[in-house]
Amino acid sequence: MENVGDGSAAAPVDSYRLTEEIQLEKNKKEMLQMSTFELKNTIAELEQRLNSVEDEGNEWKTRYETQIELNKQLERQIYILREKSENIRGNPTDRLSSIRSLDQMPVGALNQFVKHLDDEKILLENQLKNFELRIEQEAKAYYKVNNERRMYISEIAQTSVTQEAAKKQQSDPAHATREKPAFKAKYNGLAKRRTMTKRRGGMTKGSHPSNMKH
């Protein structure tokens, strides 16, 4: 009878342990599937937009939408972790029962459960490092693009000043270019008249000696 009692006591413990492990595996599988699905969609969208990026506005729009997707993914993971923490906390009775179930677990099952928790911890740490790396890369890209944007703004400002100066120069010499041919014609006319006057004067002076000889 004692053996039967021990078996009946061990059965709920094993059932609870298996249920808890199955639930943890389901949660882990859901997280991985969700992360994989969202990352695939994000990569596909980025590859599609990479071919269609034409200006800085589209690039920043892509970065903004990517960051929104990452934020949504983090929010979902936070929600799942909160649910897990609430399930672990529960009410005092549930906590005591979980403690008793852990106390009654065999050493092998406890080691397996601890290993599962360690694997989940490593998974979360890797995800955290991945997000930190992405944030660092996005920050570097932001500063780079921001510096380029400032440089472009400076070049645009200088070009605008040069363009305004060119417009003023084009508006001022326009009047001078219209008057220049007339002035040149007048000058040429005066020069021709002076030349003809000099020639006539020379011919007049040259005719006086011939008249005196006769």
Swiss-Prot record:
Coiled-coil residues are 30-144
Q: Where is the composition biased (Basic and acidic residues)?
A: 165-182
| Basic residues composition-biased segments | 191-202
| InterPro entries, per database record | DUF4600
* Pfam families cross-referenced by the UniProt entry: DUF4600
Organism superkingdom: Eukaryota
The record's region (Disordered) falls at: 161-214
Q: Which UniProt keywords apply?
A: Coiled coil
Q: Which Cys residues form disulphide pairs?
A: none
- PANTHER family, A to Z: COILED-COIL DOMAIN-CONTAINING PROTEIN 169 (PTHR28671:SF3)
Record family assignment:
Belongs to the CCDC169 family.
Q: What is this protein called?
A: Coiled-coil domain-containing protein 169
